[in-house]
């Protein structure tokens, strides 16, 4: 496995062929202003169009009534606002909504999670995932490609448009975005960072940097670069108290071990305002794998120099997985040990598991360029992952 780190530039201003239109959802504000400058227009026109796009979820230039007709006609000739379409929707009894979203000839999944005081959108960054974490349904699908900026921010745009159109009492607007869907965000920096910039931009979705969270399994070179690119909340998929266990369940650990990963994490939060001096640790609870009290003591020792809060995540099963969910009693004992050490510890409430929308269950529909499924079959290992 190798990773390519690409920083945002003006590549989004290019189109596949001379007849194609530029999708304005691919452009952050800096790129949008450059686009309008190249059209001979003033930069403020970019701000006007972005406001229509993101504040009102408008994808029709003719509806942008504070823009003159001549410019609207020019825009229709060279540009478009095209978000990926929802092809299937599932609603959980707890209010969670999972959308299967078409990206080309494949699907990714986006999840809307309403709570009493907020509504969180879980967004995908890749079609599939190359990291092969053993407990994650997405990883069993293999990897196909990175999502474009328009396909990432388009998930937020599409969800905001749907939620905004629902007048039912209790449907909350999106207040938080977590990059915790399909894929490893740090292996797609050149698209993830501009998409998050749009989430934060006042002319975009205008979210607070503390309400946009990037979750990573530990692509250290990219994490080292991230702090110079954008400031958002950070969550790390740790899931183990030592390298022996993590090597097995999170294979990227063999390349960047826990010590290297945590050093990079501390470097990021030291210069981040969004994290307020601490990081969120994600720890999936696997029955008799990483959930013993001895593991809790080991985790506490490991994290003693890393300011953090710890989210314990009851594992969500999927067909063919080799693990079991930790019992409530084992999770409770684990949590109590951590709290005795003074760690803020939260047991995450499982949401959307009746529609396979819970953490680790997102599968989508992936044409596997890594041939992972074929390799597994040749090795005699059963694969039975549900696609939406």
Swiss-Prot record:
InterPro entries: Aldolase_TIM, Methyltransferase_A, RlmN_N, RNA_MTrfase_RlmN, rRNA_lsu_MTrfase_RlmN/Cfr, rSAM
Lineage: Bacteria, Pseudomonadati, Pseudomonadota, Gammaproteobacteria, Enterobacterales
Record: residues binding S-adenosyl-L-methionine: 183-184, 215, 237-239, 316
Enzymatic class: transferase
One annotated Gene Ontology cellular component of this protein: cytoplasm
Organism: Klebsiella pneumoniae subsp. pneumoniae (strain ATCC 700721 / MGH 78578)
Extra remark beyond the main annotation: Reaction proceeds by a ping-pong mechanism involving intermediate methylation of a conserved cysteine residue.
Protein name: Dual-specificity RNA methyltransferase RlmN
Active site: 109 (proton acceptor), 359 (s-methylcysteine intermediate)
Record-stated family: Belongs to the radical SAM superfamily. RlmN family.
Classification via HAMAP family: RNA_methyltr_RlmN
Top-rank lineage group of the source organism: Bacteria
Domain Radical SAM core: 115-354
EC number(s) from the headed UniProt entry: 2.1.1.192
The keyword Chloroplast belongs to this UniProt entry's keyword annotation: no
Family matches, as Gene3D superfamilies: 1.10.150.530, Aldolase class I
Location within or outside the cell: Cytoplasm
Cofactor annotation comment: Binds 1 [4Fe-4S] cluster. The cluster is coordinated with 3 cysteines and an exchangeable S-adenosyl-L-methionine.
Single GO molecular function: rRNA (adenine(2503)-C2-)-methyltransferase activity
Gene name in the database record: rlmN
S-S pairs: 122-359
Catalytic activity reported: adenosine(2503) in 23S rRNA + 2 reduced [2Fe-2S]-[ferredoxin] + 2 S-adenosyl-L-methionine = 2-methyladenosine(2503) in 23S rRNA + 5'-deoxyadenosine + L-methionine + 2 oxidized [2Fe-2S]-[ferredoxin] + S-adenosyl-L-homocysteine; adenosine(37) in tRNA + 2 reduced [2Fe-2S]-[ferredoxin] + 2 S-adenosyl-L-methionine = 2-methyladenosine(37) in tRNA + 5'-deoxyadenosine + L-methionine + 2 oxidized [2Fe-2S]-[ferredoxin] + S-adenosyl-L-homocysteine
Cofactor names: [4Fe-4S] cluster
Protein function: Specifically methylates position 2 of adenine 2503 in 23S rRNA and position 2 of adenine 37 in tRNAs. m2A2503 modification seems to play a crucial role in the proofreading step occurring at the peptidyl transferase center and thus would serve to optimize ribosomal fidelity.
Sequence positions that bind [4Fe-4S] cluster: 129, 133, 136
Keywords, in A-Z order: 4Fe-4S, Cytoplasm, Disulfide bond, Iron, Iron-sulfur, Metal-binding, Methyltransferase, rRNA processing, S-adenosyl-L-methionine, Transferase, tRNA processing
């Amino acid at each position: 496995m190798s990773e390519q780190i690409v920083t945002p530039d003006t590549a989004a201003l290019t189109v596949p062929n001379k007849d194609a239109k530029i999708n304005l959802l691919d452009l952050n504000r800096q790129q949008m202003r450059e686009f309008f400058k190249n059209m001979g227009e003033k930069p403020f026109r970019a701000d006007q169009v972005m406001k229509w796009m993101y504040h009102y979820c408008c994808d029709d230039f003719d509806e942008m009534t504070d823009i003159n007709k001549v410019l609207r006609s020019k825009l229709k000739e060279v540009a478009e606002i095209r978000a990926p379409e929802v092809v299937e929707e599932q609603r959980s009894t707890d209010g969670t909504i999972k959308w299967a979203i078409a990206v080309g000839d494949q699907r990714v999944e986006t999840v809307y999670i309403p709570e009493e005081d907020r509504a969180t959108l879980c967004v995908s960054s890749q079609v599939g995932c190359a990291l092969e974490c053993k407990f994650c349904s997405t990883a069993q699908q293999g990897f196909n490609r990175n999502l474009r900026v328009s396909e990432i921010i388009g998930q937020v745009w599409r969800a905001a448009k749907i939620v905004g159109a629902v007048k039912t009492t209790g449907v909350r607007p999106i207040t938080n975005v977590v990059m915790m869907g399909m894929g490893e965000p740090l292996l797609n920096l050149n698209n993830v960072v501009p998409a998050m910039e749009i989430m934060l931009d006042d002319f975009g979705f205008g979210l607070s940097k503390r309400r946009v969270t990037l979750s990573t399994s530990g692509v250290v070179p990219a994490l080292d670069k991230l702090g110079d690119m954008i400031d958002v909340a950070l969550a790390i998929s740790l899931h183990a108290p030592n390298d022996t266990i993590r090597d097995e369940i999170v294979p990227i650990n063999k390349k960047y071990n826990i010590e290297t990963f945590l050093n990079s994490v501390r470097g990021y939060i030291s210069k981040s305002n969004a994290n307020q001096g601490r990081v969120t640790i994600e720890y999936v609870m696997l029955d008799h794998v990483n959930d013993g009290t001895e593991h809790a003591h080991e985790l506490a020792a490991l994290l003693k120099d890393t300011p953090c809060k710890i989210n314990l995540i009851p594992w969500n099963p999927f067909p063919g997985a080799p693990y079991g969910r930790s019992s409530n009693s084992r999770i409770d004992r684990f949590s109590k040990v951590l709290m005795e050490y003074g760690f803020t510890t939260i047991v995450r409430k499982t949401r959307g598991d009746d529609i396979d929308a819970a953490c680790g269950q997102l599968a989508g529909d992936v044409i596997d360029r890594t041939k992972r499924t074929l390799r597994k079959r040749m090795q005699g290992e059963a694969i039975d992952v549900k696609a939406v």
